Amino acid sequence: MSNQRQASSASQTPHLSPAELSYLYTSLSLPKSPIRPDGRSPTQFRPLTAESNILPGTNGSARIGFADGTQAIVGVKAEVEKTVLSTDTLASGEGGESTAATSGHGSWVQMSIEIPGFRDDDALPVFLSEMMRESLVGAVVEGGDGGGDVMMAGGLKGRLVINKRWHWRLYIDVLLLSQPLSYPLPLLSLTTHLALLSTKLPKLKSQGEEDPFFDDDWEVAEYLYPRGSKLKATSGLASQYVRPPVTLLVVSVGENVIFDPSREEIAVADAVLAISVTRDTEAGNLKLLSIRTIDPPSRLTQPAVPNSENVNMLGATAPTEDIAVLNPATGEEEVPGVWRPRRGGVKRSVIANMIKTVLKKGGVGEEVLEGLEGVEVE
């Protein structure tokens, strides 16, 4: 049972023959010009539709649907909770209490993911929810000097602090509406990002250490992540505001780097990385939060048999037809046209290229964040 559960988390390996796997790998590993099954460029995402504030009774919500029919809905709810300090913090005195209460805590953000065909405690939803939650609570803003960053000092954890005795608790519920046709991480991360952008909290009317009292008028509610005017968003000044992180799925096939991979592309990938990034409000560019490696499902595929080793083909082929060549990306000897499951690791230069493509000025990461910034959340 445990082996089945572990295998089910490996991005749903499609049933492809060794010949199909070899064809896909050869097409995707062409130097500098990979041919993707759907005709996209290496850095191109699937077309999508996005909308926000679709769920009544939530503080924020969003829906994103890809062109292949997969959709996800995210709802964010917030409630006021009394801050419980540990005995060690209380024993440290007033100064320790102030530090612990104002910096926030990662446990104040809870995330749950529901995927059709998976139990709540299966490896895939648990891994995805914890990975996205860690990037959310791990994005810390240094200082708070300009723009909307005064409210976001300390990142999301600091934003949830009301005073020393009270704080907000966030519940982020993610629902994948259809069976995952590929690894669902990009869809879930983009939808969560958009839902958090649309999340509002009631305006606080109480002051200091008083029990929290809020304004009943929802029109004056404040965004969880402060937003600027449309003029600032279109002129590129929105980068001074803190934004939720996004986690991008990146694969390498040979020396090529491919974003938003499909199910078939993941099946032949040499390496699969989940890269979490956010805006660095001080430097004006992107900041790397975390990198997670995902076990490539290509390791679970069945190898092909060269004609020279096939009993049914003895005498039917020339002895020099199956000559092994060295794969420059993996350093392994392979027979052209014969599929071999990926083994070993990946070159450091390939990993560095994957990170550079995400973080560089005008790169994929900036394009994704700018596209999400343009979605209307009013």
Label the model's feature ranges.
Residues 1-378:
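Polyanion-binding surfaces on beta-sheet-dominated domains and ring/shell assemblies
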